[in-house]
C-alpha cells in the first residue's frame, strides 16, 4: 500500500496539473487568444530556443518604466536560474505624471510592486492583463481616500492610467503570460518604476521632483533598492509591506 502522505501528494499534483491544463484550454477557447497564439507561437518559440528558455515558457517577470515609456519582459525556466531579457516593448501612451497613484480618477499610472491577477480575453482594449492594484501598500498610503482600481496592461494606444502597448505586442505578451500561468506561475510579478534608475537623464528628471518632495524621495529609494538588486542578480528579492505602507526588501533565498 502507498503511504497516505504519498497518496495526498499525488492527488494534489494531479489536481494542480488539471487546473493548469483547464486554464490554457479555457483561454484558447476565446477567438482573440486562439488567433494570437497562432500568429505568435513560432516567433516566440524561436526566441525561446535562441535564449535557452524552455517552451512553453515557464516563468515571467515584467517591469515597466514610466518616464522612459518601456515595458520589459524577462523569462527563466525555474527558481534557481537567473532571468534573461526576452522582450522590450514601447509603452505607446501615458497619462498623469511621475508619482504613485493614490486616489481614484487622478489618471496616474501606479508605481510599486504588483502581480497579474486577471486575464481579460474580451477586453475593449484588444487583450488585457489586470494588476492587483491597489496592493497592501497602496491601501495604506491612500488613507481614507478611494485609491481606485482596474489597472491593466492592454492593447490599443489610449489610456487613463494603465500601461498600453501595440496590439501585436499585446498578443505576444498575453500568450506568454497565459503559458506561464498554465505552467504553474500563478503570480506573475510586475514592477512599475518611475524611471530607469541607471539612466542619467531619467535620474536628473526624478531628482528635481524628489528634491521638492521628501515623501516621494523615500518611496522612490525603496523602489530603486528593488531595481538595483534585480539588475545585479537577475533574480527577484523578497518584498514585504510594513504597517506604514513602505516596501522592505530581502535577498532572494535562491541567490
Task: Give the label of every model feature segment.
Residues 6-15:
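Sec-dependent N-terminal signal peptides
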Residues 22-52:
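Start-of-domain marker
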Residues 43-61, 73-76, 93-104, 109-116, ...:
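N-terminal post-signal-peptidase region of extra-cytosolic proteins
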Residues 77-92:
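Short Gly/aromatic-enriched secondary-structure transition segments
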Residues 105-254:
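Exported/periplasmic cell-wall-interacting domains
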Residues 17-21:
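Boundary at the C-terminal end of the N-terminal hydrophobic targeting segment
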Residues 1-2:
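N-terminal secretory signal peptides that target proteins for export/translocation
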Amino acid at each position: 500500500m502507498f503511504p497516505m502522505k504519498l497518496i495526498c501528494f499525488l492527488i494534489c499534483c494531479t489536481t494542480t496539473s488539471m487546473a493548469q491544463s483547464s486554464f490554457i484550454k479555457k483561454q484558447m477557447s476565446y477567438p482573440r487568444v486562439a488567433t494570437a497564439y497562432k500568429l505568435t507561437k513560432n516567433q516566440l518559440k524561436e526566441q525561446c530556443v535562441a535564449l535557452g528558455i524552455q517552451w512553453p515558457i515557464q516563468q515571467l517577470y515584467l517591469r515597466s518604466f514610466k518616464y522612459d515609456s518601456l515595458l520589459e519582459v524577462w523569462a527563466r525556466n525555474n527558481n534557481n536560474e537567473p532571468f534573461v531579457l526576452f522582450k522590450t516593448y514601447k509603452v505607446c501612451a501615458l497619462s498623469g505624471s511621475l508619482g504613485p497613484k493614490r486616489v481614484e480618477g487622478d489618471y496616474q499610472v501606479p508605481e510599486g510592486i504588483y502581480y497579474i491577477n486577471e486575464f481579460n480575453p474580451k477586453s475593449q482594449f484588444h487583450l488585457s492583463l489586470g494588476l492587483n492594484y491597489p496592493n497592501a501598500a497602496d491601501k495604506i498610503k491612500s488613507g481614507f481616500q478611494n485609491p481606485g482600481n482596474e489597472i491593466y496592461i492592454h492593447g490599443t494606444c489610449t489610456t487613463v492610467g494603465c500601461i498600453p502597448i501595440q496590439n501585436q505586442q499585446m498578443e505576444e505578451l498575453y500568450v506568454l503570460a497565459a503559458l506561464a500561468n498554465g505552467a504553474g506561475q500563478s503570480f506573475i510579478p510586475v514592477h512599475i518604476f518611475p524611471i530607469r534608475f541607471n539612466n542619467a537623464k531619467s535620474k536628473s528628471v526624478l531628482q528635481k521632483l524628489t528634491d521638492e518632495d521628501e515623501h516621494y524621495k523615500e518611496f522612490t529609494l525603496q523602489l530603486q533598492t528593488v531595481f538595483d538588486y534585480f539588475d545585479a542578480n537577475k533574480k527577484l528579492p523578497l518584498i514585504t509591506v510594513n504597517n506604514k505602507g513602505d516596501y522592505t526588501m530581502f535577498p532572494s533565498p535562491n541567490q
